[in-house]
Design a protein with these regions (language model features):
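C-terminal non-catalytic interaction/assembly regions of soluble proteins
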Residues: 1-147
Length: 147
């Protein structure tokens, strides 16, 4: 597959408080928009929320959000076009999605780059972990020990 990302920042406390619901609404809107286009099961979307749980995800022990959150939307599609399209839909939906307490209608997220969707290229997945028991550690290469 191929990866496309978009990066944005949020400072609206209401947006941050409703981020789980907002993410669900974004995914649902994309599914509705692409329904019947033959893209079902051809992409994944991940939201990395730096300043909330961007590093540890659901294992984050500190559940107190800061005053701003950095959003990295990570889309992997079967084709580059699918990745770019879904990333663009995610960006535009995040920008204009409604949520309780919303005051600004001009945009919810600040995007530092234009164009906001960044093609990252082919995706590689680590899927094999090689371990080999050997009798002689120097058989496959030189080993040096330093003190």
């Amino acid at each position: 597959g191929y990866r496309a990302i978009t990066i944005g920042g949020v400072r609206d406390a209401h947006f941050i408080a409703h981020l789980n619901d907002i993410q669900s609404a974004v995914v649902e809107k994309i599914e509705q928009t692409l329904a019947g286009q033959g893209t079902a099961n051809s992409y994944t979307i991940k939201f990395h929320r730096y300043g909330l749980d961007g590093v540890m995800g659901p294992w984050e022990p500190m559940r107190q959000p800061g005053h701003e959150v950095g959003l990295l939307v990570d889309v992997v599609g079967k084709t580059e076009a699918i990745a770019q399209t879904v990333c663009g839909l995610a960006r535009s939906t995040l920008l204009h999605v409604s949520f309780p307490g919303r005051l600004a209608t001009a945009g919810n997220v600040a995007f530092p780059f234009s164009p906001a969707e960044i093609p990252v290229g082919p995706v590689y997945e680590f899927n094999v972990y090689h371990l080999l028991e050997i009798d002689d550690p120097e058989r496959f290469g030189r080993m040096e020990v330093f003190n």
